[in-house]
């Protein structure tokens, strides 16, 4: 049965390396490509990726995982011809400028909002209210992201699923998420 006090970790935070101790141990035993964790309310994903060259597991920062997911989501939309002319990527003002480059590469508008995911949610609402702009992806440096508009807050469940999908996609191409 699940335990609400999370007895397997001292601090259930996907930004904290100690939250991955058991997962990393098992990943090494099984030769896994990824180790994923979320915070208790499943809004922030954490990920370690295996470096195929060294065999080491490397943690991705929120900026790194957000950038990787943004690029993957947009690449898949582009491949299927589903990037709308008014497509948008939304990020908090303290998030990496790599997102700017990804958005530009796919020809979508970059919207910068204040720190806090509620501002990303408000951009989605603004788009829906005005009928202008199509939200595609949003992220903040503190490990939060949202793919699509089904929610107004960050969602680690869809993010971890997308990370697994991206890992499988790149593995078929002979690459890891670290590559």
What does each of the following model-derived ranges do?
Residues 1-178:
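Phosphate-binding chemistry for phosphorylated carbohydrates and sugar-nucleotides
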């Amino acid at each position: 049965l699940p335990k609400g006090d999370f007895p397997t970790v001292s601090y259930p935070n996907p930004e904290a390396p100690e939250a991955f101790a058991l997962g990393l141990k098992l990943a090494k035993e099984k030769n896994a490509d990824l180790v994923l964790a979320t915070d208790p309310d499943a809004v922030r994903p954490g990920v370690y990726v295996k470096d195929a060259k060294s065999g080491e597991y490397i943690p991705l920062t929120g900026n790194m995982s957000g950038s990787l997911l943004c690029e993957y989501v947009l690449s898949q939309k582009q491949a299927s011809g589903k990037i709308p002319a008014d497509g948008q990527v939304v990020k908090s003002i303290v998030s990496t400028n790599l997102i700017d480059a990804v958005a530009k590469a796919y020809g979508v508008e970059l919207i910068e909002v204040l720190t806090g995911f509620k501002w990303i949610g408000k951009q989605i609402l603004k788009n829906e209210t005005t009928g202008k702009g199509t939200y595609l992806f949003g992220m903040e440096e503190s490990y939060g992201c949202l793919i699509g508009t089904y929610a107004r807050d960050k969602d680690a469940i869809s993010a971890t699923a997308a990370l697994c999908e991206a890992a499988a996609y790149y593995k078929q191409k002979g690459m890891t998420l670290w590559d």
